[in-house]
């Protein structure tokens, strides 16, 4: 029998795959975008950039920016009854509209 893999990217074939026309790195503006403390952001993982990538189970979740650490932002997400803190690179974040 083959032992089951428990890697970081397992079961993410659809979640972390890109359309062929969108291959490669995103535009530079996505790397340089800035967020304010208290701003709501969506976590949309950019699969071609691995630094500051959150766990894929949090792809599509919405959180609040609490601060900044280096290039990354400190984002709090409510998961069930707990508040979890993540350090996420801005390329994996999108601002919430409205």
Swiss-Prot record:
Keywords: Ribonucleoprotein, Ribosomal protein
GO cellular component, one term: ribonucleoprotein complex
Residue segments, region Disordered: 1-27
Basic residues bias: start-end ranges: 1-24
The keyword Nucleotide-binding is assigned to this record: no
Gene3D superfamilies noted in UniProt: Ribosomal protein L21 (2.30.30.70)
GO biological process, one term: translation
Family designation: Belongs to the eukaryotic ribosomal protein eL21 family.
The name this protein goes by in its record: Large ribosomal subunit protein eL21
Species classification: Archaea, Methanobacteriati, Methanobacteriota, Thermococci, Thermococcales
């Amino acid at each position: 029998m083959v032992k089951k893999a428990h890697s970081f990217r397992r079961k993410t074939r659809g979640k972390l795959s890109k359309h062929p026309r969108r291959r490669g790195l995103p535009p530079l503006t996505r790397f340089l975008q800035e967020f304010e403390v208290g701003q709501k952001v969506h976590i949309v993982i950019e699969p071609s950039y691995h630094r500051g990538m959150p766990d894929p189970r949090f792809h599509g979740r919405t959180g609040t920016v609490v601060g900044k650490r280096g290039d990354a932002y400190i984002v709090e997400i409510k998961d069930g009854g707990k508040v979890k803190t993540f350090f996420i690179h801005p390329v994996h974040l999108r601002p919430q509209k409205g």
